[in-house]
Amino acid sequence: MVGYATILFVLFSTVSFFLAPTTYSKPFCVWEMVTFGLAGVLFLQHKIRRNGIICFDTFFIPTFFLINYAHAVFIYPDDEFLPPFRFATNTKLIPYALSVAQMGIAFYMLGNILFERENTESFRRLKADIPEMAVNRCALVSLAASFGLFVFVFVLRLANGFEHLYPRLMTMFLSLIALSWFFQAQQLLPEDHNFKGMLLRNKLNIISTLLFCASHLYIGSRGVVIFLLFMLLLLINNYYFRVKFKVLLPTIVVGLILMGFLAITRVSAYNLARVDFMESLQYGLEVIQESPSILWLLLTDFVVNAKTLYDGVDYAHVNGYLMGTAYVQYLFVFLPMGGSYFTKLLTGLDMDEVRTGYILTRFSEATYGLGTNMVGDIYMNFSLIGVLVLMFLLGLLVARVEFPASKYALYAYMALFANCIYLVRADIFSWLTFFVFFLIFDWLMRIHIVTYAETVSD
């Protein structure tokens, strides 16, 4: 049934695309939302039945709704309480941009449904052969990296205020921590697949995770923490115990509220690096009480990227397409500084200059970075055809790795799962960095160092 419903959704979305009005129309936006809602519910029911509640689409589909539909249907035109919408936006393009996004998600669902594996087990633990030497080495290196970060932030106090600390290095750190959790999971005995087993088997990993997360939350950096926690959610659910919906839902609600507070305070004088927790909390409460819409303010990080969808479409119509220059960096992500070097070599531009977030910030004449939108980013590079093809391929990829047949497929799924709520407000290849680091560190942690004692015994 879900297959026929998805095909029907593709057809409805295609017709709606050609009928999209040339100015804002709330009835049209509501129609798009309703058709997506019906198709999305059927699709999610199918995916959860196959995979359980902890799967990529459980988070990806609702996030896609919030980012691309909420503003057009529920917020516009009273949107000035959201700072990015105070900058110029071509609101006439809202229906067209929304129809482009809907075409994209329809083709994502189609690719996902058509290429699902025949194995319909709702739960499967991949078992990989990981030497104990690699397990211990990865845990110790992860702990050393996290402890060094903790000292840098809390003891030396070299990070003050809202900062993104060396993003590439932090991505390496969190990839190491997640890989260490995966390695440890390969050593489990039958009696270890429970909460107690998780605690006993991951003492060093838990310390590493706490040090890493505390350091970043203290300076208001949430992204890398979210990436890591989603990876761990997947691993814990797969290897230790099934996470129940009654536990997941309140955790998500509390997490959204906390992240909303952090979003409000992190760029103010009341971030945690400058004031204590209670002062920061009081400031956040005051801002929320003064807001005309508490819900959307707490969800600011999700709903504001609708603007970059509209702006991305507008930019492409005004200035033409980027023809993939924004994606050159991902061809060389495995090389240190490779992305920036080859982007400059092949395009003549710095890496920041080809990033759609940077381009759209200048296009809107904004005074701070606006970020990007996955669909808008693809549209800026390859037009509607690119949106359809790449979203279809993304759906295909998720369908093939959600039941991983090898550790490499699991690494790809971990990288995607880390980005399950971020991907919609980023570019479609942003998960590749994690995947490449998993491959590199997997190899490094397995290198066998021949000691003098071993040489003598030989």
Write out the residue ranges for each language-model feature.
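Hydrophobic, aromatic-rich transmembrane alpha-helices
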Residues: 36-44, 177-192, 389-401
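Hydrophobic, membrane-inserted alpha-helices
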Residues: 10-17, 37-40, 206-214, 230-234, ...
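N-terminal "leader" segments that precede or initiate the main folded domain
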Residues: 1-118, 122, 209, 228-259, ...
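Small-residue-enriched transmembrane helix-hairpin modules in multi-pass membrane proteins
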Residues: 258-390
